Amino acid sequence: MYEKIVGILLDYVEVPREEITPETRFLADLKMNSLDIMTMVGEMEEIFDSTIETEDLNEIWTIQDLVDYISERVGE
């Protein structure tokens, strides 16, 4: 799950793969803006056939937060 999410994320950021860790933060470390995040979330919802609630995004700061959130919803 982690590698799949990172693979999707790499389409939205200009950061080398080796600099991305589970603790990498979307805003502070990757400098993603809200449009990037919402577009990425939409793609992940399609790929994982799961809804990521907008209000839940306030609690998803790191890549690991997103992995945990999606894993919980898709049962992985």
Describe the predicted segments one by one.
Residues 1-18, 71-76:
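Thiotemplate assembly-line natural product biosynthesis machinery
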Residues 7, 32, 61-64:
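Short linear motifs centered on Gly/Pro in flexible linkers and helix caps
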Residues 12-31, 48-59:
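Phosphopantetheine carrier-protein modules
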Residues 36:
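Two-component histidine kinase catalytic core, primarily the HATPase_c
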Residues 39:
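Conserved alpha-helix in the HATPase_c
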Residues 49-75:
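C-terminal structural segments of small proteins and small subunits
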